Amino acid sequence: MARIAGVNIPTNKRVVIALQYIHGIGPKKAEEITEKVGIPAERRVNQLTDAEVLQIREAIDRDYVVEGDLRREVAMNIKRLMDLGCYRGLRHRRNLPVRGQRTHTNARTRKGKAKPIAGKKK
């Protein structure tokens, strides 16, 4: 099992698919990485040499923000919005939808479980 960017990637899958197990790498970036390194798309992880794994690891470290660094960057961006006090920051602070969705009904995922109101009946 190869370890890239702190993630154990599955050995029996194709390299393009296995790279997507890393947070921050999707289908497009996985294809870009394999093209840069020069690995065929149908090659599987267990067929890679140590040198190829090292090349992939270096390409990811050099060109992409992944895993913990990416999570930290996103969290800092949200914190910055909240500190500014802008509309998006206020919505994050109140755990409400940020991108203009309606909240009168719906928005249960963001707001959490419905809170019962005492004495209210139909």
Swiss-Prot record:
It comes from the Bacteria. One of its GO terms (cellular component) is small ribosomal subunit. The keyword Ribonucleoprotein applies. InterPro entries: Rbsml_uS13_C, Ribosomal_uS13, Ribosomal_uS13-like_H2TH, Ribosomal_uS13_bac-type, Ribosomal_uS13_CS. SUPFAM superfamilies: S13-like H2TH domain. Disulfide bonds: none annotated. Transmembrane segments: none annotated. It holds the Pfam family Ribosomal_S13. Keywords: Ribonucleoprotein, Ribosomal protein, RNA-binding, rRNA-binding, tRNA-binding. GO terms for molecular function: rRNA binding; structural constituent of ribosome; tRNA binding. Residues 95-122 are annotated as: Disordered. GO terms for biological process: translation. Located at the top of the head of the 30S subunit, it contacts several helices of the 16S rRNA. In the 70S ribosome it contacts the 23S rRNA (bridge B1a) and protein L5 of the 50S subunit (bridge B1b), connecting the 2 subunits; these bridges are implicated in subunit movement. Contacts the tRNAs in the A and P-sites. Part of the 30S ribosomal subunit. Forms a loose heterodimer with protein S19. Forms two bridges to the 50S subunit in the 70S ribosome. Belongs to the universal ribosomal protein uS13 family. This is Small ribosomal subunit protein uS13. It comes from Methylobacterium sp. (strain 4-46).
